[in-house]
Amino acid sequence: MIVDGRLATVVIPRDAIEGAQEPDKAVMQAVVGYVNDIQRSGVYPRHEMPAAAMQTYHAVYYLAQVNNGGHGQFIRNTGIAMLPTTSGDALAGLKAMGALAQHQILVEMLAWVKANLEQAAKQNGFSARGDVLKALDDRFHAAEREKPIARLAARWIAGWPGLRIVGREQYQAEIDRLAQLNPHLPQRRVWQSVQQLRLQMTDDPRITIAAACGAVKPQPEVKLEVRPGVNMEIEGQQCMAFGVGTNKGARLCVFEKTGGRLYELDRSGGRVAAGAQLSTVGADKVQQFVKVAGQVRAAEAIDLLLRKAGLDPLAMITAWEVFDGGVTWIVATGQTRAAAAINGDGAVLTKPDQTPIAGAARDDIERYAAVAATGGESLRPPA
C-alpha cells in the first residue's frame, strides 16, 4: 500500500528472526534487508520508502560504522555531503526507539563537524581520529552497554502498524508485489540499469581499471570483478590498488591521477603483492573513453543492446578501443562475452567471432535514453 506518496508496508521473513542467536540484531538486519530488496526491485527512492524503515536503516548503519571505526569512520564513509541526510534519518530513528544517549552523541558530532569542516573531512577512524571524536566514541560505547540500540530498535519495530512477518516462500513474492505498486517502475528500472553501466564509464577508479584491462596486449583482458581498493607498496611506492578479477585470473590495478597500471597478483610466500606488469594506461586515454562514451550515449546503447539480445543488462564492461566519434567495449554478462561498438550512427553487439548479436540505430538509442531520463527525473523529491 502507498499512503501519501510513501510505501506503508514493511515485510520481513519469519525465518530471519526465529531461532536467531541474537534476535534483536536479527530484527534490525531483517529491516535493512527489506530496504535493500525493495529499493533494488521497486526502485523506490528514500522519500517514497516507509520513513521508519529508512530511519532504522541509517541508525543501524551509524551503529555499525561507530562500532567498527568510531565516529571518524562514520564521517569518512558517509561523506560530508551526505552526512545531513544520513544522520537526519538516524537521529529520527534513535529518538523514536528511545536511544536518547546515542541520539545526543550524534547531535554533538554533527555540531562538531559543522564547526570543523576541514578537520572533519580528514577523519577516517583509524590513523586520523580527533580527540573530540574519541570522547564521543567512548560515550557511545558506554551508552550501548547500558541501553543497546539493537534491543530498543527491536521493540520499536515490533510495534510498527505496517509490519508484516511472512514465510520465506512468501517474502520475495511480497517484495515483487510492492515493487509493482510503483507507477514509474519500468522507466526507473531502465534508469537503474543504465546508471550501473554509466558509473563504470565515469567513476575515475572504475573507468581506469576498465581501460587498464582493455590495454593488455596482445589481447585485452575481460574485467569480471573489482574489489575494494587498499593502500599497498608497489615498486617501492605507496599506491592505491584494487583487486581485479579478469578472464585470465586475479590481478591488481594501481589507480593514480596519471592513469592506471595492471599487474598479475602474486600470492607466493604467503603474501599479496604485485607480480608482472601487464599494461599501463594514461589519464588522457581514460578521459577520452569518458568523453566519447558520453557523446554517443554508450551506457544507454549497451543496456539497450543487451535487452534486445535477451541478455542480463547487469554487466561488467572493459574499455577496449576509442577513437573520434566512437568507442568499443567488451561486455561480460553471465557466461556471455561480447563486443559493443558504438558511434554516432548506432551500435552493434557482436560475438568474439564478430557474428552480430543485436543492433540499434541512433534514433533507437536516443529514444531509449529519453526513457532512462524520465525514470531518473521521477526519482527527484517533490518540490
What do these predicted regions represent?
Residues G229-A383:
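Extended, charged low-complexity segments
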Residues A26-Y34, I149-A154, T208-C213, C253-F255, ...:
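Generic hydrophobic, helix-prone segments enriched in Leu/Val/Ile
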Residues Y171-F242:
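Charge-rich interaction segments
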Residues D37, S41, Q65, G69, ...:
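Surface-exposed polar/charged interaction patches
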Residues P45-H141:
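Core of folded catalytic or high-affinity ligand/protein-binding domains
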Residues E118-P186:
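Long, amphipathic alpha-helical surface segments
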Residues M1-A52:
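Membrane topogenic helices and adjacent juxtamembrane segments
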Residues A30, Y34, G93, A135, ...:
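Charge-rich, solvent-exposed alpha-helical interaction surfaces
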